[in-house]
């Protein structure tokens, strides 16, 4: 992990609103995102305006008419998105959101208060799009758009993870994440894009996944997983890739193909899919084209989000599946629950249409009859979250689990922002965990469920150059984890989000909390008794980490 100071200092500042509108001139190291390179935003697969220029934050190399371009982009946003116009007008600056932002709590920077972050762009809106701002200027809370203001807009637009916790506490329901999303789109129109995010967007548009994995790499990773499972279970398992006529398309975040602890979740998927096929005949395929459920476009711009999520519906139609299961990813679910169905047309093939007229799994596999998806939070657009899927299987007693296999773990659960707040999937993961393990404890109520604190790395904030911001932003979550670690002896933090799993090992190390990180599907895989293969509860000797399920005598 990048070197961090032993102690961090948080200085709370409370300047006047007049002072707040003065653009900052000094930019903190560890909080400033790198700008994109031409190879990310001027490639054959992903092109952004003025992307052919290599920029540095201290030399933006803006186009000559950048101001007109930016304001035209703002005008376009105001005309096409009524919510943005509403959010610009109705804020009364009550401050209810101020201390709800993890970045404000961690940095003490007043411009990281959600109300102030929105005010940075709202002041430009007032100056150019309201009569009061045009006539009274600064007295009406308006300010001129110049290069210093533009730099400040970029600096603070990329100190927000779009987690929407602030919106939960806003009495008017102002969605600051949406404001920041449209602001980032405006910045992209004058050539200002964040490097970390556009690396992932370009790779996904080119190869189908954020990591740039080619089909052979993805296939090899899955085969490696099957070989590992043979060592742990003794069973010869298989999977399908690009199988036409399969019942279900499964889409995972690409980190599950190789990263740790994501890999253990991948093994859990493979065990479950083999059990369901062997026992009920339900076929589930992966795709090398739609090999990424995540969508960094949802943090960048509408156009980028639309480009990336289009491939999933196309692949579902090409393969002729009846529905899609999505894996353990956070922003996948903001995208697939709220965006995809208005950005791209859903599949129209017969198998899809027929299943969603009567969404009973028994129509695909008779032994699963009664498992229905009529009112599932994630089922509105043809998608089912893997944890809702598993919860249904457990509730209807379609799989056998042995909770004692997870007895070495004392777990707590982190609600990913986009899963809990973004789609309302709150109780199902807890239902699954309580059914596959004996030792589970929630963190304090004001830090979980719809009030969950962000991991501090979503929204494009997982970039290495933002390590200071990340460790500060994750502080509220780490304090809650420390509470259950001390009170209950928790030794693993579970989360169904790929970015969380990448962020938390660093955060736990920095905040000196000696516990592991994993995903719920790892616990499901450990507990799952492969009855279709003749396995008995006592047969399994190793967990999905390759460690003994029960400690040796004397340990």
UniProtKB/Swiss-Prot annotation:
Look up the signal peptide feature and give its range: none
A single GO molecular function term of this UniProt record? metal ion binding
Q: How is the cofactor bound?
A: Binds 2 [4Fe-4S] clusters per subunit.
The record, for SUPFAM superfamilies, names:
alpha-helical ferredoxin
- Domain 4Fe-4S ferredoxin-type stretches: 82-111, 151-180
State if Oxidoreductase is listed as a keyword.
yes
Task: Report one GO cellular component.
Answer: plasma membrane
Q: How does it sit in the membrane?
A: Peripheral membrane protein
Q: Where does [4Fe-4S] cluster 2 bind?
A: 101, 160, 163, 166
Which residues of the sequence carry a binding annotation for [4Fe-4S] cluster 1? 91, 94, 97, 170
Task: Report whether Acyltransferase shows up as a keyword of the record.
Answer: no
Q: Which domain of life is it from?
A: Archaea
Write out the entry's keywords from A to Z: 4Fe-4S, Cell membrane, Electron transport, Iron, Iron-sulfur, Membrane, Metal-binding, Oxidoreductase, Repeat, Transport
Q: How does it assemble?
A: Consists of five subunits: an integral membrane subunit, a cytochrome b-like subunit, a cytochrome c subunit and two iron-sulfur subunits.
Q: Which PANTHER family match?
A: FUMARATE REDUCTASE IRON-SULFUR SUBUNIT, HETERODISULFIDE REDUCTASE
Question: What's its job?
Answer: Has menaquinol-oxidizing activity. HmeC and HmeD subunits may together mediate electron transfer from menaquinol to an unidentified electron acceptor on the cytoplasmic side of the membrane.
Mind telling me what this protein is named? Hdr-like menaquinol oxidoreductase iron-sulfur subunit 2
